Regions:
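Short beta-strand edge/turn micro-motifs at domain boundaries
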Residues: 112-127, 139-188
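Short, cysteine-centered beta-strand-loop-beta hairpins and adjacent loop/turn segments enriched
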Residues: 95-110, 173-175
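Positively charged n-region of N-terminal signal peptides that target proteins for export
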Residues: 1-8, 12-13
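Extracellular/periplasm-exposed beta-strand and loop segments of Gram-negative cell-envelope proteins
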Residues: 65, 103-105, 136-141
Length: 191
């Protein structure tokens, strides 16, 4: 009887270990979960915090919400996973709207309008720029921007994989359709 009980307990312990090992998500599936969450996450219209200007909330809340919904409308394909102990990388191809080109168009238009005299001393420049920027960003129709990025994963002490999606500038730039790259390019041209 003792042998039978010991055997049953041993089998249960083995099954628990086997299920725990199988239940652990791979880096690839954790990245997929993170991407799905980003695409469906509810966003608050907090433009004033983003741009550090409370008046923007009232003026541009709708346009900002529309833009954020477009940002969340990216497509992705998980390409490759490489695991090395407690570290892993997952390659993801992002396809989205070319917000970088829209940003550059906005910048070029503002510069041209300033040179031509369309922007005068009486022009509310901030209002003009934000209206033009949101108009250009929200009018992008095709998902023509494509970039493959590497998401870094780390296994924590609980054996769970975590990602650097929230701090990965390359990923964020891809999700934003190259907008960070466009901003850097414009800033470099001013130097």
């Amino acid at each position: 009887m003792k042998k039978k009980t010991l055997l049953i307990v041993s089998m249960l312990v083995l099954v628990m270990f086997a299920l725990t090992a199988c239940g652990s998500k791979s880096p690839k599936s954790v990245v997929e979960d993170n991407l799905k969450q980003i695409k469906t996450e509810k966003t608050s219209s907090n433009v004033s915090k983003l741009f550090n200007d409370k008046t923007l909330e009232q003026k541009y809340g709708k346009e900002y919400d529309k833009f954020i919904k477009k940002v969340q409308d990216f497509d992705y394909e998980v390409k490759d996973e490489k695991v090395d102990g407690k570290k892993a990388t997952v390659k993801v191809e992002i396809k989205t709207y070319d917000f970088g080109a829209a940003y550059k168009t906005t910048y070029d238009t503002v510069v041209a309008d300033a040179k031509s005299g369309k922007i005068t001393a009486s022009t509310d420049v901030k209002d003009y720029v934000y209206n033009l920027m949101f108009q250009n960003l929200n009018s992008v129709k095709d998902k023509s921007y494509k970039k493959t990025v590497t998401i870094n994963c780390t296994k924590n002490d609980k054996g769970e994989w975590t990602t650097d999606i929230n701090s990965n500038v390359d990923f964020l730039d891809a999700m934003m359709g190259g907008m960070f790259t466009a901003i850097k390019s414009v800033q470099a041209g001013q130097a």
